[in-house]
Amino acid sequence: HGVGMHQDREGYGNAVPDDLKVQDMNLMQEMGVNAIRTSHYPHSQSTYNLADERGMLVYCEIPYYLLLSNAESYKTSIKEELKEMIRQGYNHPSIMMWGIENEVYQPASAAAFGKDFQINENTLVSFNSSVAKLAQKEDTTRYIVQAQIDSSNANKVCAKWSKNGNVDYTGVNLYVGFKSSVSSADDEGRKEITDTLNRKLNEYKQTYNASSMMITEYGAGANINQHA
């Protein structure tokens, strides 16, 4: 049972002190959490030290999100980040999987970022396959994983670079009941959410020809300044 955790606190930004990380870890364990996705970038070593000590399982990933560029410097940076992440975290027993991408596909909005981001499907599939193979080369002992957006088309493309054992597990970011409507907030609504999650997972299992899928993001947005 896991959660995503950002390295961020009000007043500190990304430079979260270790005592506040302990506070976060205590809260997660009180919730019954035993797995963490260090979203969406490698965290400081103290986070993984705590996970080692507490027996937490960790999904560690590079900040390769949404878009691929045709620029060679962009592609080189992604692969360098991957190698650095694996080599820095290799000796942490808590880390059980390396994440190679998060929601990377071909959104129509990519054109707004410039012509370098207008890539074709073959380029995307070829490059992401090479990223997965690089991760396997760097570490043969851990799972290679990824997260994808809740979209049939995006996952069909993603499945093309995931085949032949390139990627061990794929997760889908499913915000059912938050980014989709639910009829009520009672038992009927909960059943509706459960049924929708099961339906989507079964659909994506078929897309990837997989026996299991991860839910890599879930829940709802929150704001400490908003109260019911």
Describe every region a protein language model picked out.
Residues 113-228:
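Extracellular glycoside hydrolase catalytic/binding regions
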Residues 1-67, 71-108, 144, 207, ...:
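Active-site-adjacent substrate/metal-binding segments within catalytic domains
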